[in-house]
Amino acid sequence: MADYKVIPYSKEYLTGVRALWEEQYEAADVKRREVLFKWFTEGNPFLKDESPYFIVLDGDTVVGLWGHMPVTYSVKGKRYDGYMSQDALLSKRSRGKGIGKIVLREIKAQRDGFAGALWFNEPNFRLYSKCGWLEVPGLHPQVKIIKPLKYFKQKLNSKFLSIFFMIVFSGVNFATKI
C-alpha cells in the first residue's frame, strides 16, 4: 500500500485538485466546481481560520479530497461547534484501497467536533457506516426536481425526449426518497 498523507488543503494544491476533477467530470462541471470550491476555501464567511477541505496525497499527487463545513449545533440551548462532511472524492485508481478509512481517521485526529455527514452517495454511505457512523433515525434525505423540463433537457439533451418524459410523468410527484 502506498504511503498516503491527509493534510488540510492549501492553494498550492489547486492544480492537483483540478486534475482530480478532470479525471471524473466534464469541462463545464470542472469550471463550476472550481468556482464553488474557491468560495468554500477562500471566500466563505464562516471559515474558522482553517481549511474546510482535506486533500489526500500519494507522494506529491492529489488522489482525493474531503470537504467539511463548520457548523454550530444547539442541543437543549447549549452550543456545540462541529463540522458537516459534504464532499468526498477519490481518484478512480485509488478506490477500494482503504483510503476512505484513513481519511476519516486522520480528520478525526486533526479536528475537534467532526460530527455529521451529508449528501451521501452509496459508496460514501457504506464507508461511513463501516467506520462506525450511525444513521439518524427519522432523518430522510429527499430530492425534488424543481423544473423537470429543464432537468430532462439537460440530462437527455433532446427536447423531444424531454417533452415525452414530461407527458409520461405528468401528475407524478417528483419528490422521492433517496
Residue ranges and their predicted role:
Residues 126-128:
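Conserved active-site tyrosine of GNAT-family acetyltransferases
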Residues 65:
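Short glycine-/small-residue motifs
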Residues 78-92:
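Conserved acetyl-CoA binding element of GNAT-fold acetyltransferases
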Residues 90, 95-109:
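Conserved acetyl-CoA-binding loop-helix of GNAT-fold acetyltransferases
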Residues 73, 134-158:
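Conserved catalytic-core motifs of GNAT/GCN5-like acyltransferases
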Residues 110-121, 133-134, 139:
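Conserved GNAT acetyl-CoA-binding A-motif
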Residues 1-57, 62, 84, 154-178:
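Short amphipathic alpha-helix that is part of the acyltransferase structural core
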